[in-house]
Amino acid sequence: MAEFIKPYNDDPFVGNLSTPVSTSSFSKGLLGNLPAYRRGLSPLLRGLEIGMAHGYFLIGPFDKLGPLRGTDVALLAGFLSSVGLIIILTTCLSMYGNVSFTRSDSKDPLQTAEGWGQFTAGFLVGAVGGSGFAYLLLANIPVLQTAGLSLFS
């Protein structure tokens, strides 16, 4: 097993280990296709794609595990709760961008205040849209609403 796990780039002072999982071409390809690392995406599209994914999966826990679970308004309460959390997250992203990016001479547009503002705006629109899409799916397709009940009851 020791021959499979080595210091990253044979430098023991880096602090990372090179394992078959972390240095495989499959792992690098999978991580390279995530919107955070994909080349050529504008900050707005990057935020939109990340926001859609987060908005889509945030509604489920609020719907199935929230205080109004099992009632007729659980799905609506879950949707509104997820939108509330999205607004809080967007506010935090905006505050982070305002204090972190004061220079505008970076090569990466996401590392500037304007680029981070575009990312934040894309995140807000994408997350609310993803949450709304999940709400519409759950409200209009009954088999999706009851699919996860066996996990929590």
Curated annotation (Swiss-Prot):
Topological domain ranges for the Stromal compartment: 1-72, 140-153
Q: Which GO terms describe its cellular component?
A: chloroplast thylakoid membrane; photosystem I reaction center
Question: Which Cys pairs does UniProt list as disulfide-bonded?
Answer: none
Q: Which Pfam families match?
A: PsaL
Which biological process annotations from GO are given for this protein? photosynthesis
Bilayer-spanning residue ranges: 73-93, 119-139
Q: Quote the subcellular location field of this record.
A: Plastid, Chloroplast thylakoid membrane
> Has the keyword Plastid been applied to this entry?
yes
**Superkingdom assignment:** Eukaryota
UniProt keyword annotations, A-Z: Chloroplast, Membrane, Photosynthesis, Photosystem I, Plastid, Thylakoid, Transmembrane, Transmembrane helix
Keyword Membrane included in the entry's annotation? yes
Q: How does it sit in the membrane?
A: Multi-pass membrane protein
Record HAMAP family: PSI_PsaL
Q: Which family does it belong to?
A: Belongs to the PsaL family.
Could you identify this protein by its name? Photosystem I reaction center subunit XI
- Organism annotation: Porphyra purpurea
The gene it comes from is psaL
